[in-house]
């Protein structure tokens, strides 16, 4: 690619990626709405749901928030570069890498479609994970294609959700408290019959 336009403001991040990953020749950084929805919610993207994701993307980690365009942003990617080709950027967007522009673009399109599928699935009852032993079959095929996955180890936890960045607010953790507060308010207003409280922890 060539041209006379100014360089991306994320040139520091691009150079840092290529310094740590000599195989990377193309980077796509975008803000697609569905993937970015997960990023701004800091909601870990579930694993073991769609075979195509396990085969062609693998884990989709979320990097910690850092100010765009800064050295901190570039360095926030480094711990994830060795094992991943696609990332959600907390409160920001998404980034994918590849051996050429098509591969990096394909990965971006794939994670955006996956996030869209997850959002739709949640609206009709949620998703069901594939059994870990079946996922392991997919990861072994992936390895044979030359795409090793660090989860193919003895006793690896294949399907647990990703971990959000340290300090991330998790609205989901508040749901039991919110439900209890709403129940008590409705009960006091006489709109809900008094009943036994659910046992606490």
Predicted features along the sequence, with ranges:
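Glycine-rich flexible loops
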Residues: 1-194
């Amino acid at each position: 690619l060539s041209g006379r336009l100014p360089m991306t403001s994320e040139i520091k991040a691009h150079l840092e990626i290529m310094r740590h990953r000599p195989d990377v020749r193309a980077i796509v950084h975008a803000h697609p709405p569905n993937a970015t929805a997960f990023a701004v919610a800091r909601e870990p993207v579930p694993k073991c749901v769609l075979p195509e994701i396990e085969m062609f993307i693998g884990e989709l980690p979320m990097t910690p928030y850092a100010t765009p365009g800064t050295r901190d942003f570039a360095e926030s990617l480094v711990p994830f570069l060795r094992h991943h080709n696609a990332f959600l950027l907390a409160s920001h967007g998404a980034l994918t890498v590849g051996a050429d522009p098509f591969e990096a673009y394909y990965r971006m399109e794939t994670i955006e479609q996956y996030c869209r599928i997850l959002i739709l699935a949640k609206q009709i009852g949620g998703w069901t994970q594939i059994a870990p032993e079946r996922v392991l079959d997919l990861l072994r095929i992936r390895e044979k294609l030359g795409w090793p996955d660090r989860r193919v180890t003895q006793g690896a936890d294949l399907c647990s959700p990703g971990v959000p960045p340290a300090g991330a607010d998790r609205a989901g953790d508040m749901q039991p408290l919110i439900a209890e507060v709403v129940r008590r308010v409705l009960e006091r207003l006489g709109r809900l019959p008094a009943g036994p409280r659910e046992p606490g922890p």
